[in-house]
From Swiss-Prot:
Lineage: Eukaryota, Metazoa, Chordata, Craniata, Vertebrata
Official protein name in the record: Protein cornichon homolog 4
Gene name for this UniProt entry: cnih4
Keyword annotations: Endoplasmic reticulum, ER-Golgi transport, Membrane, Protein transport, Transmembrane, Transmembrane helix, Transport
InterPro entries associated with the record: Cornichon (IPR003377)
Short name of one Pfam family: Cornichon
Amino acid sequence: MEAALFIFSLIDCCALIFLSVYFIITLSDLECDYINARSCCSKLNKWVVPELVGHTVVSVLMLVSLHWFIFILNLPVAAWNIYRFIMVPSGNLGVFDPTEIHNRGQLKSHMKEAMIKLGFHLLCFFIYLYSMILALIND
């Protein structure tokens, strides 16, 4: 059972890694003016909720299965994702708003956030991989 949990977490983490890379590529395309702000934000806003759900599901599964270290490791990023989603101003189209993305350095902050998430998900990938191997050996 524990091995299945870590296999699912590993697959989910791979999806979140690819999603972080997609965010970085799309934001860098906007930064270089290869795409306009409206198409960039519409592409990115489609993936905010799946990212939120994917990360929250893994965090809850770690809590339920009593893997405290991994849960506490995932908790700040999951809380940040939920906070960011809830605190979208009422006039904005989503977390990524085409009218606001070039103001006050938001593009750079979104890019920095995507890079940090990529590093975090890579760290989690190796933790899940190690835990999966350990669970398979112990079974």
